[in-house]
From Swiss-Prot:
Represses a number of genes involved in the response to DNA damage (SOS response), including recA and lexA. In the presence of single-stranded DNA, RecA interacts with LexA causing an autocatalytic cleavage which disrupts the DNA-binding part of LexA, leading to derepression of the SOS regulon and eventually DNA repair. PANTHER family: LEXA REPRESSOR (PTHR33516), LEXA REPRESSOR-RELATED (PTHR33516:SF2). GO terms for molecular function: DNA binding; serine-type endopeptidase activity. It comes from the Bacteria. Keywords: Autocatalytic cleavage, DNA damage, DNA repair, DNA replication, DNA-binding, Hydrolase, Repressor, SOS response, Transcription, Transcription regulation. The record marks A88, G89 as: Cleavage. One of its GO terms (biological process) is SOS response. This is LexA repressor. The gene is lexA. Belongs to the peptidase S24 family. HAMAP family: LexA. Homodimer.
Amino acid sequence: MRPLTPRQAEILELIKRNIAETGMPPTRAEIATRLGFKSANAAEEHLKALAKKGCIEIMPGTSRGIRLPVEEEDNSETGLPLIGQVAAGEPILAQEHVEQYYQVDPSMFHPSADFLLRVKGDSMKNIGILEGDLLAVHKVQQARNGQVVVARVDDDVTVKRFEKKGNLVYLHAENEDYSPIKVDLSFQSLTIEGLAVGVIRNGDWL
């Protein structure tokens, strides 16, 4: 691969991080906004340069028509990543959060799992999610009432049952010793990181 300019390297890293965080590449307008370009056309010129160097593939006719070529995918780790401590403001799937990889077939869960999260505490014990379990999580950004979610409230990550009423979100524990977490979206930050789709305990499928 031909060497990249610092700006091209910055854009390529942004594309990779956006795919890891949301499952999709950024639009030209999003790239321009995040990197301070005056217009989406400026971002387009950098994307064309990256495509010429073989770093990305551009699919015409769609705003998110950016794809990483197969040969650029990192195959040094396989399986599902186990996410450890999550840094404030960082995507949950950022490489620095990955403790290790488990050789688990994501398709064994429905919907398929994207990552694993180690359970801390007993707030969900009544539905069999226990301290030390590995929770299989399907990456989504929205949830329906009643679903068990991995949510980030401000900068704290928690596993709870989701309920939304207007501008208020309640994150319910499955343990009578815990009160619901109340989030007022008018001034608090809430991010849905994924849905709980299964549990691994002591190497067994539950």
